[in-house]
Amino acid sequence: MKVGTILTATDSNPLYCEFIPSFVKAWKKLIPEADICIVLIAHEIPDAYKPYADHIRLFPPIEGIHTAFQAQCIRLFYPRQIARDEGVLITDMDMLPMRRSYYTDPIANIPNDTFVVYRDVCLPSEIAMCYNIAHPRVWESVFGSASIEDNFRKIYSEVSYDGQHGGSGWATDQIFFAKQFHAWAGPKAVLDDRVTRFCRLDR
């Protein structure tokens, strides 16, 4: 498998959307052959980010659902829409990559029909959103073909979500992810931090 698209999402919260320039530059330097897709939960691209418009996909906010929730959960469903038939890697808006080999080497010999979870730290009840990769058709196989809005409304109706980092419902995306992943009967690979030599610097 190869990394074909790097996908993340954000709403208009400056705590996250202000990472757009750094995110694009960092990934373009590390994996220049990959496409970058930033799903922006908004009606229009702010002027400050128009230089990066080629990498931004607008998703109009769905009324009645917190935009932070939409930005978190859309990373599970939007990969189905990617046209490029290579791996779609999802990540956080405020996570900047530092080592190319961490992303490319562990998946080099993994078949394209496999869903790969890079980190085993949250299992079994959750799956960390950083990092996971699969081909678009595999994403669809795991998360179904129902519309993004239908999925959002169903999930949102079943949780209490306050939009605060670490607050009520904040891990909904990771909990739902784990539920779908465990129920899926296709080939899976869960990587080990000790083998991939995972390391991060926190801001």
Where do the protein language model's features map onto the residues?
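Conserved glycosyltransferase catalytic-site signature
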Residues: 69-76, 170-175
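N-terminal anchoring/stem segment of glycosyltransferases
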Residues: 1-64
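GT-A fold catalytic core of metal-dependent nucleotide-sugar glycosyltransferases
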Residues: 74-118
